[in-house]
């Protein structure tokens, strides 16, 4: 699985056990990702921060 990084055109191959890509952004600015990474369990969104997780290559 490869997940996008914050830098455009770069991606990261996920280590074993981390089979989700996620994108984190502030609810106030949904078009501007704050973090993009590999993760094992999708974090819960809050009032300020939203997480979008997926399990296909570069879907974040």
UniProtKB/Swiss-Prot annotation:
A GO biological process held by the record: killing of cells of another organism
Annotated keywords: Cardiotoxin, Cytolysis, Disulfide bond, Membrane, Secreted, Target cell membrane, Target membrane, Toxin
Pfam families recorded: Toxin_cobra-type (PF21947)
Disulfide bond annotation, renumbered to this chain: 3-21, 14-38, 42-53, 54-59
Tissue and organ distribution: Expressed by the venom gland.
Molecular function terms, GO-annotated: toxin activity
Subcellular location field: Secreted; Target cell membrane
Gene Ontology CC: extracellular region; membrane; other organism cell membrane
Subunit-structure text: Monomer in solution; Homodimer and oligomer in the presence of negatively charged lipids forming a pore with a size ranging between 20 and 30 Angstroms.
Role played: Shows cytolytic activity on many different cells by forming pore in lipid membranes. In vivo, increases heart rate or kills the animal by cardiac arrest. In addition, it binds to heparin with high affinity, interacts with Kv channel-interacting protein 1 (KCNIP1) in a calcium-independent manner, and binds to integrin alpha-V/beta-3 (ITGAV/ITGB3) with moderate affinity.
Family: Belongs to the three-finger toxin family. Short-chain subfamily. Type IA cytotoxin sub-subfamily.
Descriptive protein name: Cytotoxin SP15c
């Amino acid at each position: 699985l490869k997940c996008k990084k914050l830098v455009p055109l770069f991606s990261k191959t996920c280590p074993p056990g981390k089979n989700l890509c996620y994108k984190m952004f502030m609810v106030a600015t949904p078009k501007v990702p704050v973090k993009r990474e590999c993760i094992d369990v999708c974090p819960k969104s809050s009032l300020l921060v939203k997480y979008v997780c997926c399990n296909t290559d570069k879907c974040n």
